[in-house]
Amino acid sequence: MARIAGVDLPRRKHVAYALPYLFGIGRTLALQICEKTNIPQNKRVEELSDAEVKAIRDLLDAEYKVEGDLRREVQLNIKRLMDLGCYRGLRHRRGLPANGQRTHTNARTRKGPRKGMLQRRPAATK
């Protein structure tokens, strides 16, 4: 099993479909990596030689940020926005959408489950 950037790639998949299992690599970038390392896209991960795995690993280390480094950079960017106190930072701090989406009826993913209305108790009768 090929282990790249701390992630085990699925053995039975083609290289072009296995590389997107790494955070920060999508389908297009996976195809570019295959092209740069001269590895056929339809070759399966289990068929890769140690030299080919090393070539992919070296290319990722040299040219791209993936996994932990990329996650850290994204978190630092969000933290910087919050420290600046700009509008986007405030939206992140409040857990609301930051890119202008409506929140009156939607944005349930960011806002969490509905709070529900409080039920009034009927007045006591004498």
From Swiss-Prot:
Q: Where is the composition biased (Basic residues)?
A: 105-118
UniProt KW RNA-binding keyword: yes
- Per the UniProt record, one Pfam family is Ribosomal_S13
Q: Which portions of the sequence form the region Disordered?
A: 92-126
Any keyword Transport?
no
Query: What keywords appear on the UniProt entry?
Result: Ribonucleoprotein, Ribosomal protein, RNA-binding, rRNA-binding, tRNA-binding
The record's GO CC annotations read:
cytosol; small ribosomal subunit
Identify the domain of life: Bacteria
Q: Which GO terms describe its biological process?
A: translation
GO MF terms listed in the record are: rRNA binding; structural constituent of ribosome; tRNA binding
PANTHER family membership: 30S RIBOSOMAL PROTEIN S13/40S RIBOSOMAL PROTEIN S18, SMALL RIBOSOMAL SUBUNIT PROTEIN US13M
Biological function:
Located at the top of the head of the 30S subunit, it contacts several helices of the 16S rRNA. In the 70S ribosome it contacts the 23S rRNA (bridge B1a) and protein L5 of the 50S subunit (bridge B1b), connecting the 2 subunits; these bridges are implicated in subunit movement. Contacts the tRNAs in the A and P-sites.
* Family named by the database record: Belongs to the universal ribosomal protein uS13 family.
Q: How does it assemble?
A: Part of the 30S ribosomal subunit. Forms a loose heterodimer with protein S19. Forms two bridges to the 50S subunit in the 70S ribosome.
The name of this protein is: Small ribosomal subunit protein uS13
Gene designation per UniProt: rpsM
